[in-house]
UniProtKB/Swiss-Prot annotation:
Name of the molecule in the record: Probable cellulase Cel12b
Active-site positions on this chain: E50, E133
Entry's Gene Ontology BP terms: beta-glucan catabolic process
EC number annotated for this UniProt entry: 3.2.1.-
GO molecular function annotations of the record: cellulase activity
Any one Pfam family match given in the protein's UniProt record, by short name: Glyco_hydro_12
Annotated family: Belongs to the glycosyl hydrolase 12 (cellulase H) family.
Keywords of the record: Carbohydrate metabolism, Glycosidase, Hydrolase, Polysaccharide degradation
Organism, scientific name: Mycobacterium tuberculosis (strain ATCC 25618 / H37Rv)
Enzyme class: hydrolase
Function: Probable cellulase. Can hydrolyze barley beta-glucan in vitro. Could be important for the survival of M.tuberculosis in the environment, perhaps in amoebal hosts.
Top-level taxon in the UniProt lineage: Bacteria
Length: 151
């Protein structure tokens, strides 16, 4: 399926997405979205800004950086982490309660991140990915459905 990314942030009306995860009760893992942005319309390489949304995690793992506050986005509560992974700025939103199924607008997270990072309307949304990061075990971890669209 084709994509209309990269797209300039200021030209995006909405970016609806939905996910349905399956979570095991064992292992060390996280289930997250990665939203990538850059000041240029990149299609390869490392982007300047990564936004991670941790829907759920298990074990003693955490995002890079340190917690900088709390926020509510589209009715869900998150602890916000800010840091760098050595290649780009990384902002992570860690859900305070597990989220298994959710439909939301990616731009809600882009807009919130732009209040703390140098993202402007002239930057580009380059990718939206959903996935799983099993650190150990994680049998049963899965995605039943995922969709994303940029309007």
């Amino acid at each position: 399926m084709g994509t209309n990314l990269p797209t300039e942030v200021g030209q995006i009306l909405s970016a609806p997405t939905s996910i349905d995860y399956n979570y095991p009760t064992t292992g060390v893992w996280d289930a997250s979205y990665d939203i990538c942005l850059d000041s240029t319309p990149k299609t390869t390489g490392v982007n300047q800004q990564e936004i991670m949304i941790w829907f759920n995690h298990q074990g003693s793992i955490q995002p890079v950086g340190s917690p900088v506050g709390n926020t509510t986005i589209e009715g869900k509560n998150f602890v916000v982490w800010d840091g760098s992974n050595g290649m780009n700025n990384a902002m992570a939103y860690v859900a305070t309660e597990p989220i298994e199924v959710w439909s939301f607008d990616v731009m809600s997270f882009v807009d919130h991140t732009a209040t703390m990072e140098p993202i402007t309307d002239s930057w580009y949304l380059t990718s939206i990915r959903a996935g799983l990061e099993p650190w150990s075990d994680g049998v049963g971890l899965g995605v039943d459905s995922f969709s994303a669209k940029v309007n």
